[in-house]
Amino acid sequence: MRWPGNMEKIVICLMVIFSGTVAHKSSFQGQDRLLIRLRQLIDTVDQLKNYVHDLDPELLPAPEDVQRHCEQSAFSCFQKVELKSANTGDNEKIINVLIKQLKRKLPPTNAGRRQKHGLTCPTCDSYEKKPIKEFLERLKSLIQKMIHQHLS
């Protein structure tokens, strides 16, 4: 007669373990989405570097040496910039797809929510304007910094 009681305990233990695993995984899911998105952005920037000569040569505000906790703000400055294809050649469609990928919002994070409270970050207009190649290098550097901070 004791067997059903033990079986119930085992089933309950397994359910607790399973639900704890699911809860643990879902709490990290948003973080994983951010990391995946940031790594995709690195690839996108690298691809855009191949088309530097096909982009409008306009000088663009490019954040550098971004203060800690101002990364999201600086990233949004990069996203607000109007990157444009310089010609209507074969590469225009590819460039436009890459630019759209850069403009997609990042998944929400706790750090992003904290940043909105009480921290004063530089405005987009305050950043020095740079040629497109340096703009892309600084964007990549910022994304790498965001990945590093996310992992630490």
UniProtKB/Swiss-Prot annotation:
Signal peptide positions (record): 1-23
Cysteine disulfide partners in this protein: 70-121, 77-124
GO cellular component, one term: extracellular space
Single GO term (MF): cytokine activity
Similarity-based family: Belongs to the IL-15/IL-21 family.
Function: Cytokine with immunoregulatory activity. May promote the transition between innate and adaptive immunity. Induces the production of IgG(1) and IgG(3) in B-cells. Implicated in the generation and maintenance of T follicular helper (Tfh) cells and the formation of germinal-centers. Together with IL6, control the early generation of Tfh cells and are critical for an effective antibody response to acute viral infection. May play a role in proliferation and maturation of natural killer (NK) cells in synergy with IL15.
Protein known as: Interleukin-21
Organism: Sus scrofa
